[in-house]
Swiss-Prot record:
The keyword Ribonucleoprotein applies. This is Large ribosomal subunit protein bL36. InterPro entries: Ribosomal_bL36 (IPR000473), Ribosomal_bL36_sp (IPR035977). The gene is rpmJ. GO terms for cellular component: cytoplasm; ribonucleoprotein complex; ribosome. It comes from the Bacteria. The lineage of its organism: Bacteria, Pseudomonadati, Pseudomonadota, Gammaproteobacteria, Moraxellales.
Length: 38
């Protein structure tokens, strides 16, 4: 999981979700696209 100041979708399968006040990107097609803001 990458931790970045700015998270954005990398591919069409990426989804932006909020968990516990943080913004996450989850991706079913490519697990390397997982990101968290912070």
């Amino acid at each position: 999981m990458k931790v970045q100041a700015s998270v954005k979708k990398i591919c069409g399968s990426c989804k932006v979700v909020r968990r516990k006040g943080r913004v996450h990107v989850i991706c079913t097609a490519e697990p390397r696209h997982k990101q968290r803001q912070g």
